[in-house]
């Protein structure tokens, strides 16, 4: 169950982040609302991640710690990306970092979970 919550929350964070970036020029109010909803999903990701950490540590404790750090970095990069967008500063670098870090984090997550819940 926690795997599904974790996966759905990560997908929601990625979708909400991309939507917020695209919608900013049209509506700053909607942008702020999406940013707040994103933060609720951060809490879900952190809680579900805590509940699943014992299974990841059984697989490989070094990779589990690295995945935890990568997850924290993803949240930080999303926050920087959205705050830079709100301040109308260039976001290209953070967008590139966001894509790279998300791909690494997702890959580690599926490796540590043995593909669960998507490939099981």
From Swiss-Prot:
One Pfam family, short name: DUF1516
Spans traversing the lipid bilayer: 3-23, 33-53, 62-82, 92-112
Lineage top rank: taxon: Bacteria
Localisation per UniProt entry: Cell membrane
InterPro entries, A to Z: UPF0344 (IPR010899)
Annotated membrane topology: Multi-pass membrane protein
Any one annotated GO CC term: plasma membrane
Keywords recorded for this protein, A-Z: Cell membrane, Membrane, Transmembrane, Transmembrane helix
Family according to the record: Belongs to the UPF0344 family.
Name of the protein described by the UniProt record: UPF0344 protein lmo2265
Organism of derivation: Listeria monocytogenes serovar 1/2a (strain ATCC BAA-679 / EGD-e)
């Amino acid at each position: 169950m926690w795997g599904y919550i974790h996966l759905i929350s990560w997908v929601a964070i990625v979708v909400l982040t991309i939507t917020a970036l695209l919608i900013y020029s049209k509506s700053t109010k909607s942008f702020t609302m999406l940013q707040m909803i994103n933060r609720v999903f951060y809490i879900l990701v952190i809680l579900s991640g805590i509940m699943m950490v014992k299974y990841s540590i059984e697989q490989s404790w070094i990779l589990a710690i690295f995945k935890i750090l990568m997850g924290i970095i993803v949240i930080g990069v999303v926050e920087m990306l959205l705050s830079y967008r709100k301040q109308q500063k260039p976001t290209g670098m953070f967008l590139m970092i966001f894509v790279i870090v998300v791909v690494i984090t997702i890959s580690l997550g599926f490796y540590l979970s043995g593909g669960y819940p998507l490939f099981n």
